[in-house]
Amino acid sequence: MPGSPARGAAMGGGPRGLRKTWTELLAGRVKKQKYDPEREQKLKDSALKLLRYHQNMHDLLLEVEEPQCKRLRLSELIDRDSADASSDRSASFIRSAFRDQASRLGVPVGVLSAKVFARSVQQVCVEPSHPVLLSPEQSKKLSSLLMIARHLLAQNMFSRLTFCQELWKAQNSLLLEAMWRLHTHSVVSLQELLQSHPDSEAMAMWLFRNLRSLCEQIGASCPSPDTTEAMLSGLVQLLISRGFQGSSDPRRLVEPERLPQVATDVLQRMLAFSLDTLEADPQTTLDCQAVSGWIPIYSGHTCCGVVTENSLKSFFSHTLTQILTHKPVLKVSDAIQMQKEWSFAKTHHLLTDLHCRVLATLGPEESVGRLQEVLEMQEVNWQHVLSCVSTLVVCFPEAQQLVKGWVASLMARAFESYHLDSMVTAFLIVRQATLEGPYVFPSYADWFKESFGSSHGYHSCSKKTLVFLFKFLSDLVPWEAPRYMQVHIFHPPLVPSKYHSLLTDYISLAKTRLADLKVSLENVGLYEDLSSPGDIAERESQAVQDVKKAIMVFEQTGKIPMPVLEASIFRRPYYVSHFLPTLLAPRVLPEVPDPRVALIETLKRADKIPSSIYDAYRKACASAEKQQPENATSAQRTEADCAKEPLGLLTAALEELRALMTDPTQYSVISAQVAVVSEKLNAVLGHRNDGGSLQRAKIQLSVLPSTLQKQDQAVVDLLLTAFCQNLMAASSFVPPERQSPWAVLFVRTLCGHVLLPAVLTRLRQLLRHQGQSLSTSHVLGLAALAVHLGECRSMLPEVDPDVLAPSAGSLCVPDFLNSLLTCRTRDSLLFCMNFCTAAVSYCLCKFSALRNCLSPGLIKKFQFVVLRLFPEARAPCAPEHAACVPWRPLYLPSADWQRAALSLWRRDSFQELLKDKEFYLTYRDWVQLELEIQPEADVLSDMERHDFHQWAIYERYLPAPTALGGCGGDLEEACTVLVSEIMDFHQSSRSYNHSEDSDLVLGGRTGNKDILSRLQEIALDLELDQGSAVPHGCSTPQSHFLFRVFRRRLQALARPDSMATSLRRQQELLTCKRLLLCLPPSVLVGGPQAGQPISPNCGEFFSLVNSELRNFCCHGSVLTSDITIHFFRGLLRVCLRSQDPALVANQTLTECQTKCPVILTSALLWWSSLEPVLCGRWMRCYQSPLPRELRRLQEAREFASNFASASASPAPSPAWIAAAALHFAWRGVRKEDVTAHLQRLDCQREELLIALFFFSLMGLLSSYLTQRDTAEHLKAVDICAEVLTCLERRKVSWLVLFQLTEKDAKLGHLLHLAPDQHTRLLPLAFYSLLSCFSEGAAVREAAFLHVAVDMYLKLLQLFVDGETRLQGHSESQGSPVQLITKARVFLLQLIPQCPKQCFSNMTELLAGRGDCDPEVSNALRQRQQADPSFDLYQEPQLF
């Protein structure tokens, strides 16, 4: 024992102050004595007897588990009861000790043990380290005491009542956990403990204080949460079951009424404490922690199975009433002014959590009924009432109709009995519900118009109802926000004309109030929404919002927003005083103009910015650039720091939402948390939220890969990451079809913000450029997001994905997301498979139909990928029947995407889907997708790709009927589709790097050569089939399918009325030419049938050359070498197949002279490349000279080459061929040599000189258009001048070249030798040669004045149309304005010198064109009407 004298002796002093231990003293005696079992038993009995008569029971119990006690403990005796025979002696010792003690004291043993045990428990709880919880050491001691107590209870040696009474004597030192341990170890129950307390009030206070401390520990995340939560749950169950038990409960007849009163009092105190704490707006106080720990008890799961349903309903109904009526100190006027601060998002999250839990247990219908009852019968706390209404409509969509019905009944009652309270209640509830946005409740403006804007409104019964309404609205004026008065003014109630004074009186009152508040109706913002819940913004801040919105709309549309245009006219004061100063705020202008600069410049050009204001703005910007603020960096840093706080709140809200995903019991509060996320998102975006994307007709995205601001990208990445994490968390518990509607709510939140374009931009970056680097969770999450965006497609605007290619048109969101998935390379194709597999699987699991959720293009891409990657999918297979589509394996870490894709392909549900034509992969779809493939980065090898093409074309699509997207066995149809899709691909934004001289490698890639090879193979098969199967008696061969495709596509493109259209048409023609070069050359010539020596059918090719290629694919007066050589190769091939090759060649080339002469001039230019091919093949095949027409071309070339020599042969016929050859020969000759050649022109025929002058004019115009070399231009001018001099010297009229028409029998064919642009620019050539005209030519030829005036008027029209604009002008060329000035002076000097007969047809010439130059026109008319002696100038100087 602690006071043993032997121990003190053993520890006494020794010779050197050292004391021996008891063991050391007995060491020697132990060795000397022999072991005697009988003596050992006697010693043990003597020791027990000594303890029995000298034991202090209180000290004994406290001694249990003392660390310093090395002797046998009481707990150890109990622990060994079942282990050895000494357990009976241990139990006997405990009982004997208490019996002996009770016998000496004369008290019952149960009372003694209870008192001793109570004092021991109190001693354990002394000096607690925690208000309600035991320390680890205290817990161990109490565990041993509980074991002793249970042993005594089993022997009927323990009085529970006495124990409880003894405990309460020192209640201030008792710990709640000790009481709980007594209850859980069945020593005494909580009910017994509470029932035995002598003072109900004191017991209630003690329990309230301990519950609050316990909740503080729960809210602060204590180290033993299981214990604390079990304690709180058990106590609450007891309080609810005893405080709200029904009167039919038989226990109420035998139990006193004191415990129910205490239970009710404690619950009310805790709720009142929570409401008071939340009203004080706590942050991180202990009271707030206590409230956060207490709120979760308001859940039906807490008392499930323990408390009866009636008791639970009674408790929650009582709780809702207490919430609504807690401290009703706010007046109605206070509620009208303050209710905007009580919206769901602005209310403390713990209070909304409390509302949500209570309302969820009661149900929407009962909750609305309880609200009605409380509002009618009691005074209420308007803050709690209105915040409860917000929670009701936000968290319980089914309650929205109930609230609308409630409001309707209140309004009907108000106007029936003129009940003002009902009117007040209805308006407050409506305004509160509208604070939550249009997705929850109609806007206040819409409700007000619906209620009072028609003849069926509540107020339309009588004059008394009108007076009642306007009296009520007038009473609201001093208290309500300006926003509501504006709604009443802009959307007034419908009032009969005889009572119109009531309305005007109210409007006057409201306008006066608005004026007092300094809110002007004229200064309402351009984009201000009268239905929004916020206050009227200051004009400056509203102007800032208007400017931001205007810039955003301008950036999307490229046009001045209509509200800005209207404001510049009808709301001039606001526009000039507020909008323009905000828009034109001085700043350092960016090097690359941003949308703000572009909008300002557009407004300036439209005269919407006064010059003085604009000049001041430019000067201020220049000053700002010179005085660059040094603190710009710090200002940006401050702005970034300010943005971090709302972003952190948004992150926290998203984390709370993810936590709810993993708890199925919390699904009821998910919608509330999504609303919190929406509010935090609004805070991050600031004023940029425009109330929803529904107001936008189209979203226009930039083509640049990184156009997001840093904050926007951070927010978007946060939202997308949260969505993916939420999906994985929710799917780890339940499949998609059993999940809560969190995803729909989340996506609607994204759709309702101005951030939606940023979300779509980020999705484009991720799916198009970073798809292969995304993890499995990201792929699954983004695929599910795409599905839900498709579900919301009706409420989303269309997307214009490319501002550089507006002709592509806008896309709905599902089609836009589908356009982001490409199949060009191995990585992109595999990512496309993964994404499509995830999206289709999720959609089939989540919904019953795919029609509204996914783009048909995505389904088709999935088919394309599966058929391409898996040969086993190409063979018919029996569909797999399963209860559901396999979604769960996809979100496992080791997802086998290929196996999942094949499994989905074989599912009967998916195969059933493919029976719908909308989702079936047709031949045209297959070609479009296959054109995207880049063979060098393809997942298939060359042989595998070839086999796949052969299977797809010849086994799948060629024999398939056209109704199923096939070709119906028609090779021509297969070729037509290939050609059309190749051309579409070449014109689309998927292809780039076009150049006129490049091969048909679409998009600058080699990926299309395989498809071109398939086209060549099919075209060759088609040519063989058509050659061997000619209809009997058919003399006119059918047109080639290729020209039919070209003709149809070119007709679809309008004539080039703009530069963009012209370029598109030119690009289309380049594609046509390249396809012609890829196919056999016989396509150009057509070819006679076997055994028929007739001319081949070249009409379609001639028509294409004359109408299209001559204008867009032509170098001056010739076609390009490739198409020219290709034509002659085709001609040779047709000749080789005919009976008389020379006849076919001669007839074809003779036809070219009249129908398509540009082919012959092209052959002359490229003769050096063409002659070896023609001569070599002709000699090898026929061993005979060239046909006559080919020799004519050969002779023309020889004539041009030997023109300067004395032995030059005479010019061959026709003269224009010789002239063309001569003109082309001079291209490569130096200027000095050309002069020598020109001296020999006098001996040539007139026809040759006229044609040569025409070709020289075309060369001059080509030098103007190309602008490559000034020397070449001077050379061209010299040639024209020399030829013109020769013509005038020989007195050959050349004016006819400037008046050519196709009906001209002699020279009309020359118009087919040059592009139309060159012939339109002949006036430019005419006056470029002004200095070359001889002095007498003007007077000598009567037609000269007519031609000169006509050319001048046409030159003016060319200048007006912009066709004289050149990239640069050399000094020798001069500018178009200078040329027009010279021409004008020339005419004004020429007109007086011309004889009267020169003006005979001048009236017709000036008809409709006289206003182009009034001075010239007047001079012509006066000279025409003047006498012969009349003269304007005595001595004209023409040159």
From Swiss-Prot:
Keywords: Cytoplasm, DNA damage, DNA repair, Nucleus, Phosphoprotein. Residues 1-20 are annotated as: Disordered. Pfam families: FANCA_arcN, FANCA_CTD, FANCA_helical, Fanconi_A_N. PANTHER family: FANCONI ANEMIA GROUP A PROTEIN. One of its GO terms (biological process) is regulation of CD40 signaling pathway. It is found in: Nucleus; Cytoplasm. Coiled coil: none annotated. Mainly expressed in testis and lymphoid tissues like thymus, lymph nodes, and spleen, and at lower levels in kidney and ovary. One of its GO terms (cellular component) is Fanconi anaemia nuclear complex. A motif (Nuclear localization signal) lies at residues 19-35. Belongs to the multisubunit FA complex composed of FANCA, FANCB, FANCC, FANCE, FANCF, FANCG, FANCL/PHF9 and FANCM. In complex with FANCF, FANCG and FANCL, but not with FANCC, nor FANCE, interacts with HES1; this interaction may be essential for the stability and nuclear localization of FA core complex proteins. The complex with FANCC and FANCG may also include EIF2AK2 and HSP70. Interacts with FAAP20; interaction is direct. This is Fanconi anemia group A protein homolog. InterPro entries: FANCA, FANCA_arcN, FANCA_helical, Fanconi_A_C, Fanconi_A_N. Phosphorylated primarily on serine residues. Phosphorylation is required for the formation of the nuclear complex. Its main location: nucleus. DNA repair protein that may operate in a postreplication repair or a cell cycle checkpoint function. May be involved in interstrand DNA cross-link repair and in the maintenance of normal chromosome stability.
